[in-house]
Amino acid sequence: MARSTWSGLNDAQLLAQCEVDTYRASGPGGQKRNKTSSAVRIRHLSSGLIAIAEESRSQHENRVKALRRLRQAFYLQMRDPIDVQGLTSVSQRAELASVRSPAGKFEVGRKDVRFWPVAGLVLDVLEATQGRVSDAAGALGISTGHLIDFLEMEPKVWQQANQLRQRFGQKPLKTGN
C-alpha cells in the first residue's frame, strides 16, 4: 500500500483503519498510573505498523502521541514509488516548494508539520536513485551537503536513509559532527 493512500486522511479516518489497545503501563507515576489503562498501542491493520505511547498518565494524550508516531512511521517506512523519468519533476512538487529557501536549501524544522511529508518524499527519491545521495540531491534541486544536513536533522530519518542505502549495497552515510 502506498503512503499517498492514507496521508490525506484525518485522525478519525485513520483511526477507523486501526486497532487501538489500551493497557496499564509500568514504571514511575504512582498509584494513578498503576490503576488506569492509560498506555495506548495503535496498529494499522493493512500495513501492520504499530505505534505506542505510554509516557503520560492521560490516555487521551497518549492516543494523540501514538497517532502522531504512527504517521511518522508511515513516512519513514512506506515508500511511494517514483520512476527514474519522474525524478526531473520532483523538485517542482508543492511540498518541496513550500520549504525551499531562495538559496535552494530546505528550511523546515523537525517540529514543523511539513517536515514529515518532505522527509517521506526525500526518502522516496533516495530509493528511486538507489541510495545515491548526489543523484537524489540533484533531483530535489538542492546540494548534496544540504541533503545530508536535512537527513541528519532527525535521527530516525538518518537511520532509515542508511538502511535504504544498505539495501542497495551502498556504504552508510557518515555524520558531519
State where each predicted segment sits.
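DNA major-groove recognition helix of helix-turn-helix
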Residues: 151
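C-terminal flanking helix
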Residues: 155-159
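Short amphipathic alpha-helical segments at helix boundaries and their inter-helical linkers
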Residues: 161-163
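Helix-turn-helix DNA-binding helix
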Residues: 147-148
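The alpha-helix within a helix-turn-helix
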Residues: 136-137
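Helix-turn-helix DNA-binding elements, focusing on the entry/boundary residues of the two helices
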Residues: 132-133
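Ribosome-associated translation termination/rescue signal centered on the conserved GGQ peptidyl-tRNA hydrolysis loop
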Residues: 1-124, 128-129, 140, 166-177
